[in-house]
Amino acid sequence: MKKLVKLGLLGVGLIGKRHAEIILQSKNAKLTAVADPDQSAEKYANKIGVDYFSNLSEMISSSSLDGVIIATPNNLHVEHGLECIQKGIPSLIEKPLASSANDAEIISRAAHENGVAVLVGHHRRHNPIITAAKKIVASGEIGDVRSFHANCWLFKPDEYFDESIWRTKKGAGPVSVNLVHDIDLLRYICGEVVSVQAQTIKSRRGHENEDVASVLLKFDSDIVGTISVSDTIVSPWSWELTAKENPAYPPTSESCYLFGGDHGSLSVPDLTIWKNNDKRGWWEPIDSAKHSIITTDPLMNQIDHFCSVIKGNKPPLISAEEGLKNLKVLEGIYESAESGETFKIT
């Protein structure tokens, strides 16, 4: 009988419960315990049949865990991540890695110095659609990629903000909450970001953050492209509504990413390639063809990958260093928007 990887879950909020649901279905992992100071978490633990603890220290000392999933508020990630690292326990830390690049660097350095694996929960990288898109771009099928456009237009209703007041506070706008996913995927496909130019518009609902942002990114591969994000636009063009990852979002047949190469273009997530038949040119006929793939749940893929990381079979697909790089770009967006200047990423 296969030995299951024993996991503990810290934080039983919305994403924490989603992790629990996935682990309970996993063929490679077993959820042993959960920890959360909220009393409702104990009822949840009893409901799903696992041990309950009020904090991480108790869970680690009282359970024989192979790994821990950290799904707590961003400002607690550095404290909880360091505790796992100091105990020699691999962790999967939800995105973003920390509330600042400085805190992310502390986690990244500690993980490296102690030789303890940290996987950052940018789960979309585990989607077969993204794996296929990266391969198409890397293969040269559309030639040298010169530019891209990414769209993340959503309309979050008032009740979304009423449920959790922190969503109205500074640092909880669509750039931090939503765009960080797109930054990670674009870095994964296009390379490292070297400079950022950005404009943001203050929330019309009176929140402390932005509700619209446009960003120009330049990569070390000489790719330049734009991202537009908003949580106040009704549209079908976002990863949530196009990728069909989460059944909570009604699916559309649209795309949200466009990659333009000198031999063709690629739309994602539908993986449609547009190319001229023979001679390239704007007067020449252009046809499309779709790549077909077998889709699987990226959250389940992430848990399976975490198990492989714990066993030492694979390095983390999104290491703490990768999480740090995403936060540097994120902070660069805010710096550029505030100063009106191009911000160089170092």
What is the role of each PLM region?
Residues 1-48:
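N-terminal Rossmann-like dinucleotide-binding module
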Residues 1-4, 67-70, 268-269, 305-346:
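C-terminal helix-rich "cap/oligomerization" subdomain common to oxidoreductases
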Residues 19, 37, 48-110:
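Beta-loop-alpha module in the N-terminal Rossmann-like domain of NAD(P)-dependent dehydrogenases
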Residues 54, 93, 118-120, 149, ...:
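Hydrophobic residues in well-ordered beta-strands that form the structural core
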Residues 106-124, 143-149:
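Rossmann-fold dehydrogenase core element
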Residues 124-208, 213-217, 340:
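Predominantly a Rossmann-like dinucleotide-binding segment in NAD(P)-dependent oxidoreductases
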Residues 206-210, 220-301:
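NAD(P)-dinucleotide binding in Rossmann-like oxidoreductases
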